[in-house]
Amino acid sequence: MKKAVKVTALSLALAFTSSLAMATENIAFISGDYLFQNHPDRKMVAEKLESEFKARVEKLTANKKSIDEKIAASQKKVEAKVAALQKDAPKLRSADIKKREEEINKLGNSEQEAINKLVTAHDEEVSKYQDDYAKREREETAKLVDSIQNAVNTVAREKNYTLVLNEGAVVFAADAKNITEDVLKVIPATQAK
C-alpha cells in the first residue's frame, strides 16, 4: 500500500512538473512551402537560372532541329533511291535489281548509323545540361532555404518562441501561433544582411 501511495505521489509530481514545463514553452508554426513559394527572391532566382542556361537551351534546340532535318533528308534520299528502283525495275535484270536493293540497304544502314551517332551525342549533351541545371537549381534553392531559416530564427528570437514547427508536423494549432507571414516579412531584411 505504501508503494502505491509513493508511485501515485511520484506520478502526480511528474505530471505537475511536465505541465509547468509545457506552460513555459512558447511554440509556433510556419508553412515552409508557403514561405518558399512566396520568397521575394524566388522569381529572380528562376530568371537568373533561365538566363544562365539560355544559350545552352538554344544550342540544344538548334541541334535537335538540325538532327530532325538530317533525318528527313536521309529518309528522302533513301525513298528517292527506292522510287528510282521501282521505276527502273521493269527494265532491269534481277541481278541488277538485287544489286541496287543491296546499295539501298547499305545506304539506309549508313544513314541510320550516322543519325544514331548524332542522336547519341545530342542525348549526352541534354543529359549533361539537365545535370548541370539541377545542380545549380539545388544550389540556389539551398540559398533560399537558408534565408528562410534565418528569418524563422530572427522571428523566433524576437517573439521568444522556444520551438517553431513546420505545419506538416502540427496536428492542431491556433491561428495566432502561425508566424508564417511574420517570417515572410523578415526575409528581405535577412537577405540584405
From Swiss-Prot:
<dbReference type="InterPro" id="IPR005632">
    <property type="entry name" value="Chaperone_Skp"/>
</dbReference>
<keyword id="KW-0998">Cell outer membrane</keyword>
<dbReference type="InterPro" id="IPR024930">
    <property type="entry name" value="Skp_dom_sf"/>
</dbReference>
<dbReference type="GO" id="GO:0050821">
    <property type="term" value="P:protein stabilization"/>
</dbReference>
<dbReference type="GO" id="GO:0051082">
    <property type="term" value="F:unfolded protein binding"/>
</dbReference>
<keyword id="KW-0472">Membrane</keyword>
<comment type="similarity">
    <text>Belongs to the Skp family.</text>
</comment>
<dbReference type="GO" id="GO:0061077">
    <property type="term" value="P:chaperone-mediated protein folding"/>
</dbReference>
<protein>
    <recommendedName>
        <fullName>Outer membrane p25</fullName>
    </recommendedName>
</protein>
<feature type="signal peptide">
    <location>
        <begin position="1"/>
        <end position="23"/>
    </location>
</feature>
<dbReference type="GO" id="GO:0009279">
    <property type="term" value="C:cell outer membrane"/>
</dbReference>
<keyword id="KW-0732">Signal</keyword>
<dbReference type="Pfam" id="PF03938">
    <property type="entry name" value="OmpH"/>
</dbReference>
<dbReference type="GO" id="GO:0005829">
    <property type="term" value="C:cytosol"/>
</dbReference>
